[in-house]
Amino acid sequence: MKTLLLTLVVVTIVCLDLGYTRKCLNTPLPLIYTTCPIGQDKCVKMTIKKLPSKYDVIRGCTDICPKSSADVVVVCCDTNKCDK
């Protein structure tokens, strides 16, 4: 009986979201996700225009969505892995 109870507790802990787990991309290419720190509950993708046909892309976690400008397009979202 104790084994069954312990198994149920372990399964419950594994299945429940017990902490902060927002996941966002953290590299220019959409390959590697990272868990955001506490307080940063949005994913951000910033596309920066460097030359007429060249762009840099920055992805990561943020607490406040920055504003877009003429040379920087900012897209924020608040679900896991949404900054592709």
UniProtKB/Swiss-Prot annotation:
It comes from the Eukaryota. Its main location: secreted. One of its GO terms (cellular component) is extracellular region. Pfam families: Toxin_cobra-type. Residues 1-21 form the signal peptide. It is found in: Secreted. Disulfide bonds join 24-43, 36-61, 65-76, 77-82. Expressed by the venom gland. InterPro entries: Cytotoxin_Cobra, Snake_3FTx, Snake_toxin-like_sf, Snake_toxin_con_site, Toxin_cobra-type. Keywords: Cardiotoxin, Disulfide bond, G-protein coupled receptor impairing toxin, Secreted, Signal, Toxin. GO terms for molecular function: toxin activity. Belongs to the three-finger toxin family. Short-chain subfamily. Aminergic toxin sub-subfamily. Negative results: does not affect blood coagulation and does not show significant hemolytic activity. Acts as a beta-blocker by binding to beta-1 and beta-2 adrenergic receptors (ADRB1 and ADRB2). It dose-dependently decreases the heart rate (bradycardia), whereas conventional cardiotoxins increases it. At 100 mg/kg, intraperitoneal injection into mice provokes labored breathing, impaired locomotion, lack of response to external stimuli, and death (after 30 minutes). This is Beta-cardiotoxin CTX14. It comes from Ophiophagus hannah (King cobra). The lineage of its organism: Eukaryota, Metazoa, Chordata, Craniata, Vertebrata.
